[in-house]
Amino acid sequence: MARLGEPRLATTFVLVTKTVVVTGVAGFIGSRVAARMVHEGFSVVGVDDLSSGKVANIPSTIEFVEGDLAVQGTITKLPKQCAAVLHLAGQSSGEMSFDDPVADLHKNTVSTLNLIQYAISVGVQRFVYASSMSVYGNVPDAPIAEDEHVAPLSCYGVGKLAAENYLAVFAKQLSSVNMRMFNVYGPGQDMSNLRQGMVSIYLAQALANKHIVVKGSLERFRDFIFVDDVVEAWLRAATFDGVGGSTINVGTGVRTTVAQVLETVKGHVAGTTVEVTDPTPGDQNGIYADTARLRSVLQMNEFVGLAEGVRRFSEYVKTA
């Protein structure tokens, strides 16, 4: 798979302008997507309300708009010519969505609807949306495909699914791709947020206290994907021809239990102990991706494995 600075697969999709909007640009994934788009020769306008993102994450080579996308005043600051919108802004924790469901709705659904209307008004060619595995809810112990039944368990999942449905409503006016993100981890993740990001939570606790508190069973399972692989998938979703109208699982297809994650993390922080407590509301017991569509549509066939990804992440945190 192509890495930063290496040639990537050819595409016949031609964007009429080199200007793209990346939302959530001060966040973990959005900042890296923006940097990659700049590297590929695009002019990036980045948007973030800085409620959770960090100014230090924002690439210095982009134009930055600070504001809440649920507010029309922010939308009016966006460029009148734009080829693609890569929408990664939003509240990203299922657990936290129960704290204030209305705020979660504004962050994840109202903001998306506003951006959809903006994208249509300026003739955007491609709208890429950060959806989530949370739309599926509890599923059988088998790889979950995009066309399977959806039944979200959290306010967060409901909001993500609603945004997908808004994109479906406007499908004739806007070419979009729903990226159903699985458990993304890696360098740059917010280590102070202990309510979002399983790998980052466990690694942060291990490094700080050599003690990890696990909310829920060690037999729960997930699909962990390294941030570099996610960035590559987003670039392809924005620029590949023929992918509009797709919903794509962004995972590796590898079933990994919480116990396996803990052993991997403990391998980098000797002497770490583990305490198991009650699960959080709306938490899925287990889920991992069927990646057939990711492989066929976006031609993603190689991924960073968990052991190597955690090694890179741990080294990054220890030297940061």
Range-by-range predicted roles:
Residues T23, H106-T109, G157, S192, ...:
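Short, solvent-exposed loop/helix junctions and linker helices
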Residues I29, M198, T257:
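Conserved alpha-helical elements of sugar-nucleotide-dependent glycosyltransferases
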Residues G53, G94, Y136, Y185, ...:
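Flexible, glycine-rich phosphate/dinucleotide-binding loops
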Residues L115, L167, Y202, L294-R295:
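Structural element of the ATP-grasp superfamily
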Residues N138-V139, P187-Q189, R293:
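Short beta-loop-alpha junction of Rossmann-like oxidoreductase domains
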